[in-house]
Amino acid sequence: MCLLMLVLGAMYVQGWHSAGFGKRTLKKRCYPGQPGCGHCSRPNYCEGARCESGFHDCGSDHWCDASGDRCCCA
């Protein structure tokens, strides 16, 4: 059971949960200080990129929403 949780945890960290197990998408995960979460096309527009946790710096013109799921334009 513990090993299963470890494997699932590793898959979650790699972002497979957002792609449906194995199907990799072009969506980038955002980490604190990491640039390139996409470019802002309009104010307050949220992209589908994943954030490591809420309200981290997702690049110069992005922030993470409270759910930690999206990068939004400032």
UniProtKB/Swiss-Prot annotation:
Biological role stated in the UniProt entry: Potentiates activation of mammalian TRPA1, a non-selective cation channel involved in perception of pain, in vitro yet has an analgesic and anti-inflammatory effect in vivo. Has antibacterial activity against C.glutamicum (MIC=50 uM) and, to a lesser extent, against S.aureus but not against P.aeruginosa or E.coli.
Note: Negative results: has no effect on mammalian TRPV1 and TRPV3.
Any single GO CC term annotated in Swiss-Prot or TrEMBL for this entry: extracellular region
Position of the signal peptide: 1-18
GO biological process, one term: defense response to bacterium
Designated name of the protein: Tau-AnmTx Ueq 12-1
Record propeptide residues: 19-27
Compartmental location: Secreted
Tissue specificity comment: Detected in mucus secreted from ectoderm.
Organism: Urticina eques (Sea anemone)
Family: Belongs to the Cnidaria small cysteine-rich protein (SCRiP) family.
SS bond partners: 30-37, 40-71, 46-64, 51-72, 58-73
Keywords for the protein's UniProt record, in alphabetical order: Antibiotic, Antimicrobial, Cleavage on pair of basic residues, Disulfide bond, Secreted, Signal, Toxin
GO molecular function, one term: toxin activity
Signal recorded as keyword: yes
Main location: secreted
